[in-house]
Amino acid sequence: MSKEEIWDKVLELAKNELTPISYSTWFEPPKTELIDIQENTAIILVESNFVQDFLKKQYTDIIADLIEKAIGTKLMPNFVIQEDLTEDKQVKDSAKAKSEAKPDVQAPQNSSEDQFNVHNTFETFVIGPGNRFPHAASLAVAEAPAKAYNPLFIYGGVGLGKTHLMHAIGHYVLENNRDAKVIYTSSEKFTNEFIKSIRDNETEQFREKYRNIDVLLIDDIQFIQNKEQTQEEFFHTFNDLHQTGKQIVISSDRPPKEIAKLEDRLRSRFEWGLIVDITPPDYETRMAILQKKLEEEDVDIPLESLTYIANQIQSNIRELEGALTRVIAYSRLQNEAITTELTAEALKDIIQTPKSKKITIQDIQKVVGQYYNVRLEDFAAKKRTKSIAYPRQIAMYLSRELTDFSLPKIGEEFGGRDHTTVIHAHMKIQTDMSEDPIFKQEVENLEKEIRNQ
């Protein structure tokens, strides 16, 4: 596979996994280019020093993971600008340094702060009504591992601060106990390492790595659904850590009861401690997040421009910060002062003005009803024939995915059904989608149609 083919594949994955703002701002061609692969390093050419610094801080691990998904081999990215390439030796030295600095996958990373983003601390976390309780719980766990809440299970949508809190816990524990053994990983990395340990006959080393620690922080646990062997291994890892008084912190995009194809014994253990959810930030919190980001960037932006960003991007902190970074980058590259007009111009490809119509449950029922030939009134009726009940479950699933309405409110819009019925419908459709690619595509097409109304 050529460098161009590899990078095309990485960009295709990035487009699916990153937010539209992040992808179009930093990676959309021709903003990045894979120019060389040396030992364990991918040399990636970017446009400017500003972009280089930002990608190094925010995207090194993400791009490494995407490269591994694309080609099956983990390469650490080294972001370079044209000036770095004046002498080929510079690139080679850089690649060598990167390779030598990279720890072996089985080597203990337990007490290394390199696992954590230096910016993701409790001090930089902006507290608001939607995250106050998760922040307090995370701080309590960091101050007294395995004494407060064990496990701590944090769930919420993409880009709301779950990973920030997990990194903050790691930083705090290590700052207060340099001998502590802390591992932060994702369920996907855990799975990949487990598979590799079986293939290489190194399961004992794998278990030593994950069980001889003080704190385990595991992100995106929902991705172990359907992975029976991984669930079995994680079950025993969980038990070993919990029984020996070690702290476990887990994050997910949904609560344990809504993770389909998860063993009941694992679901039960996830519910042993404290479950907290992070919700989208309100206007005041969004403004505070933008102000905090400005302090980090040491940039002044007119209040009107900040207000514009906060009003246009409401549900995702990552997209909110990405929008601000895009505006700053656009201003610097255009050599223009930041104004409301420039802000709107910088974000015109990302947000719609006037603001997009908010999706309602009635919108969802209308689209699903038209597709499956179900009358609107039948969504609220007591009829249980499959030709009506199944489209009703699909509409409930989409209502949970595409709106911010509570479970009781969704149930109310479907004839006063109980919130447990909504949960069951969501899990049922989620399971069916995971088992049937054609049905999954069908539901995704419905979602696109609803969003594009």
Curated annotation (Swiss-Prot):
Superkingdom per UniProt: Bacteria
Protein name: Chromosomal replication initiator protein DnaA
SMART domains: AAA, Bac_DnaA_C
Region listing for Domain IV, binds dsDNA, in residue ranges: 332-453
UniProt main location, coarse: cytoplasm
Disordered: region residues: 91-113
Biased amino acid composition, Basic and acidic residues: 91-103
Family, as annotated: Belongs to the DnaA family.
Alphabetical GO biological process terms: DNA replication initiation; regulation of DNA replication
Positions of region (Domain II): 73-114
Location of the protein in the cell: Cytoplasm
One function term, GO molecular function aspect: lipid binding
Annotated stretches, region: Domain I, interacts with DnaA modulators: 1-73
Any one Gene Ontology cellular component term annotated for this protein: plasma membrane
Keyword field: ATP-binding, Cytoplasm, DNA replication, DNA-binding, Lipid-binding, Nucleotide-binding
Residues that bind ATP: G159, G161, K162, T163
Protein role: Plays an essential role in the initiation and regulation of chromosomal replication. ATP-DnaA binds to the origin of replication (oriC) to initiate formation of the DNA replication initiation complex once per cell cycle. Binds the DnaA box (a 9 base pair repeat at the origin) and separates the double-stranded (ds)DNA. Forms a right-handed helical filament on oriC DNA; dsDNA binds to the exterior of the filament while single-stranded (ss)DNA is stabiized in the filament's interior.
Assembly and interaction partners: Oligomerizes as a right-handed, spiral filament on DNA at oriC.
Keyword Transferase attached: no
Organism the protein comes from: Staphylococcus carnosus (strain TM300)
Matches recorded under Pfam families: Bac_DnaA (PF00308), Bac_DnaA_C (PF08299), DnaA_N (PF11638)
Chain spans, region Domain III, AAA+ region: 115-331
